[in-house]
Amino acid sequence: FYVTKKGVCVNTKDMGTAVDPASMNVGWYYNWDWKSFKDMSFSNKKFDDLEFVPMIWGDSMTETSEIFDNVKSKGYKYLLAYNEPDLKWESNVRPDVMQYRWNDCVNNKGNVRLGSPAVSVFPTWSNDWWTPFWNSMAADKKNAMSFIAVHSYQKSYDGAKSALQYLQAIDECWETYHKPIWITEFAFWKFSINDAAGCAKVQEFMKIVIKGLNERSYVERYSWFSFNTTDNSNGASALWTNSTGKLTDLGNIYVNN
């Protein structure tokens, strides 16, 4: 593999202000931007020596050619492309419009390994967005896609069976498209950190799934989405407390598995 599969996604607003990536046993990070924390002069300097993977978040960002010029000048090897274009409150780009955006990416990418647009569900489940996008793409444009970026959030848990079903969905994505996979967001949309039973479910899910991801050679990288511990709906998925950077029990599981 290119580096340790395990990474972390953090923003400048709250997630990344206090956490020390050296405590996380991760090999890379991204921040939903094409500029690294170092280039932003971000207050938390502890990310400066960690591999950064840039992203074209959506149409609101700088021109594609400028982003690629920066990526190449910095020597970055990878680029993530378009964050949840299937959602109106995210990058919100229609599949037919994405054809033109993707062509721009392909024409500018050079030797950069280019990730797919990351829809909000498994690509194999995205009949309204991913399927028409993929089916209308020319063969050379498909070939230019170095890996598929996957987002997935659990809303229920039925024991180990749910974790195994998750891994089966990852397998299905590989078997359908035969592209390496980066899981750039995954977590639970459920359970407060004060819900002991809920926390136990999330922890069991993580242990099973990370073991499975590490065993699958076609899964190149993954990064858990860490909600804050203060989130009453999703705090059980927190890897650390945003204000202090202190790891949670789940965070320690992420580190050690």
List each model region and its residues.
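Loop/turn elements at helix/coil->beta-strand transitions in domains of secreted/extracellular proteins
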Residues: Y2-K6, S23-W28, D48-F52, K74-L79, ...
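N-terminal carbohydrate-binding/catalytic regions of secreted carbohydrate-active enzymes
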Residues: Y2-Y78, R101-D104
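Solvent-exposed loop/turn segments at secondary-structure junctions
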Residues: T12-M15, D33-F37, W57-M61, N83-K88, ...
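Aromatic- and acid-rich polysaccharide-binding/catalytic face
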Residues: N31, P54, K77, N83, ...
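Aromatic-rich peripheral "rim/lid" segments of glycoside hydrolase catalytic domains that contact
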Residues: K46-P54, N194, G212-N257
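An active-site-proximal structural segment forming one wall of the substrate-binding cleft
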Residues: W57-A81, S91-V112, S126-M145, E172-W174, ...
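Alpha-helix N-cap and loop-to-helix initiation/capping positions
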Residues: V93-Y100, W125, D158-Q165, A196-F205, ...
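Active-site clefts of carbohydrate-active enzymes
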Residues: S116, T176-E204, F225-T241
